[in-house]
Amino acid sequence: MSPQTETKASVGFKAGVKDYRLTYYTPEYQTKDTDILAAFRVTPQPGVPPEEAGAAVAAESSTGTWTTVWTDGLTSLDRYKGRCYDIEPLPGEESQFIAYVAYPLDLFEEGSVTNLFTSIVGNVFGFKALRALRLEDLRIPPAYSKTFQGPPHGIQVERDKLNKYGRPLLGCTIKPKLGLSAKNYGRAVYECLRGGLDFTKDDENVNSQPFMRWRDRFCFCAEAIYKAQAETGEIKGHYLNATAGTCEEMMKRAIFARELGVPIVMHDYLTGGFTANTSLAHYCRDNGLLLHIHRAMHAVIDRQRIHGMHFRVLAKALRMSGGDHIHAGTVVGKLEGEREVTLGFVDLLRDDFIEKDRSRGIYFTQDWVSMPGVLPVASGGIHVWHMPALTEIFGDDSVLQFGGGTLGHPWGNAPGAVANRVALEACVQARNEGRDLAREGNEVIREATKWSPELAAACEVWKEIKFEFDTIDRL
């Protein structure tokens, strides 16, 4: 017998394939405060027991592979392996269950959302033993979240920078999103800001196309910002989209924005990638720029109920990677979002400590230990009649963003902005007086139309516009 064979035998190596559950299903395991916890919705192939499927998820997203390998004897699997510690049936779903998996902290690089996702969701979703797999939630322990900078500034610092308190902020996405020249684009920005909005915005796919190169757009938008500020006495901003084909180009655009003296830039964090986003967030903190985040591509990942990843996980990842705003659905507009589920991840974005609440889809108590919060952005198919509901649902710490609901005003861009600002001020005043916006919202808007012909015209245009499709984002 060779020395190598003797060594393998001495550590108990036995080649072959064994069930995952023998190693990775540990219902007796007591989770640690430092563990990263995951809740997976698992749909196994017919004939695969839940314990085996849950253990396979834990194995393939941590230390496991399809066969026994002799190098297992060179490390401590018990220290590094993921563990499926609980299986929870789903009422009314015979073929699905929730598998809870605990991962030891040492499996993950500090301060890297990229490494976190590569480990937990990078490979296991293509596993043949599973028909479908969805990551519903993650618990990020303080020991790990403290390795991240998080948002460049956070909610309170942003309000202090803007000197705006006691109400939601108002925004507008410039439309048409593609095709305008830089000068005409800047004109629309000026008209909206002059009319009373706090922000205007590049759409997610406005980067640097032949009809409008990024440098020209940045310059004309900066001119619009300064002109509107001088005329209104308010601090204004435009989300200048720095997203680019390379990280170097992205940083060049952010640096140019800072040199122009504008307050905020923007990034598409999913298409741009977490590594690029974290780099940009660090630059923004160091240089006093706010960072608006668009979630373009999120529905490819999060819209299916049984496969992919819920947006609450993407929201937590963004808070760690860094962003001061992120789009979060509207509940009442044209884009997906069920009320309680939406408010669940809105709280995960804004609050320091969020209790477990399965009625809102929150599987774990989350303690952010003073990491700055992120402002949720409500955007997509909303107009002045939605203002009471949006004010009541999202509260003051939010951005309400009306694209077509501003630029579609029959009198033009500036009157559209005036209508939205008047509607917002009326709703905030009514709420502060103790009125119930959920019940009296339409009456509040009608009363305000007496003092604002711009609002009256907007109410007439959009009085019958509704998006009455059922949401598929349900618990």
Swiss-Prot record:
Substrate binds at N123, T173, K177, R295, H327, S379. Residues 1-2 form a propeptide. Pfam families: RuBisCO_large, RuBisCO_large_N. It catalyses: 2 (2R)-3-phosphoglycerate + 2 H(+) = D-ribulose 1,5-bisphosphate + CO2 + H2O; D-ribulose 1,5-bisphosphate + O2 = 2-phosphoglycolate + (2R)-3-phosphoglycerate + 2 H(+). It is an enzyme of class 4 (lyase). Binds 1 Mg(2+) ion per subunit. It comes from the Eukaryota. The modification N6-carboxylysine is found at K201. Its cofactor is Mg(2+). Keywords: Acetylation, Calvin cycle, Carbon dioxide fixation, Chloroplast, Disulfide bond, Lyase, Magnesium, Metal-binding, Methylation, Monooxygenase, Oxidoreductase, Photorespiration, Photosynthesis, Plastid. The modification N-acetylproline is found at P3. One of its GO terms (biological process) is reductive pentose-phosphate cycle. The active site is at K175, H294. GO terms for molecular function: magnesium ion binding; monooxygenase activity; ribulose-bisphosphate carboxylase activity. It is found in: Plastid, Chloroplast. Belongs to the RuBisCO large chain family. Type I subfamily. HAMAP family: RuBisCO_L_type1. Heterohexadecamer of 8 large chains and 8 small chains; disulfide-linked. The disulfide link is formed within the large subunit homodimers. RuBisCO catalyzes two reactions: the carboxylation of D-ribulose 1,5-bisphosphate, the primary event in carbon dioxide fixation, as well as the oxidative fragmentation of the pentose substrate in the photorespiration process. Both reactions occur simultaneously and in competition at the same active site. The basic functional RuBisCO is composed of a large chain homodimer in a 'head-to-tail' conformation. In form I RuBisCO this homodimer is arranged in a barrel-like tetramer with the small subunits forming a tetrameric 'cap' on each end of the 'barrel'. This is Ribulose bisphosphate carboxylase large chain. It comes from Taxodium distichum.
